[in-house]
Amino acid sequence: MPIDQITLDILWSRLIATVNEQAAALIRTSFTAIVRDSGDLAAAVFDRRGRMVAQSVTGTPGHINPMATGMVHFLERFPIDTLKPGDVLITNDPWMTASQINDLTIATPVFKNGRAIALFANCCHALDIGGRGLAADSRSVYEEGLYLPLLKLVDAGKLVEPIFDIIRANVRTPEEVIGDIHSQIIANEVGAQQLLSFLDEFGLADIESLADEIIDRTEAAMRAAISAIPDGDYRSQMKIDGFDDKPITIECCVRVKGDDLEVDYAGSSGQVPLGVNVALNYTQGYTTYGIKCAISPEVPNNAGSFRPVRITAPEGSILNAVHPAAVGGRHLVGHFCPSTVMMALADALPEKVQAPGFDGIWNSQLEGELGGEGHKRFAYIWFSAGGTGAMHGKD
């Protein structure tokens, strides 16, 4: 049964408040500045089918959008009806979620009356993951650190201690890394508690009908925004610094046909034996972000906003690198996708797109030994970036 507009607005506001509280719990309990202060994270709620329904206002496109499209991998490995109350799942597989092994994604099912009704998930940057980490001169993902396939981190409420032991043994800052993992677990629990309270208050058994309504309306709004663009192929090219005096080229074609939009990166540079390659899910995440900023910034970001958009890049290219390519510095290339898309749409949407700015974020990481008893090590990461480009009427 369709939900009336007033009720939908109330339910939507409560859902957003729920995921915002989830993110706030992660930030307030985190052991690291990269989560607490930089907000290098994502938090969201998914329905039983793995569709993202709502995301927190705090987060980055490189975390939230790959996590949104990546939940299908969790449910393929652990079908929803095989999960138990108290289960928690984890992975840092770059080709499943955020395209970098420093980014840990943790998902938790929510149960009501013995049935899994939703999942809460979050993704944030681990202070250290062993190996060479963010170094752009890694030759393969094997050099970059500890690679965690999709695993059950907590089984029916009991910590799977061998996994925690493996993580501790492979990272330079185990207290902070393990501490943040517990923060991620707690954040999902906070979201689950708020969701169950919200469902009880409104007499709902699950979020399926609400999810359908939100996602369908979002898709319709996104399609309406695409339909306002004249049909055609819109092209752009971006050249950025590479290595050994070999620039990296991003070729982009935005193809609009009716209420469907395709972004094709055919012609872009091939993947390289260095850590600046980008997995396709990260390319999709930042491309979707660029599209939404240009044509529909007011439309919610959920599974519905992804449906009308198709993003492709040739396998083995810099924007669709294949395993075991090194991807630790994928942001050095992937962050240029939004500007490349907007450059392509400049003729069609001159008053909506933004000129390119300082797209390539600069991460600085310090590691060392504090000295004294135990030879405890430290690590610290900070971000540096420049200004953004101008827009029509906004220098």
Residue ranges and their predicted role:
Residues 1-85, 90-395:
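Glycine/proline-enriched, intrinsically flexible loops and inter-domain linkers
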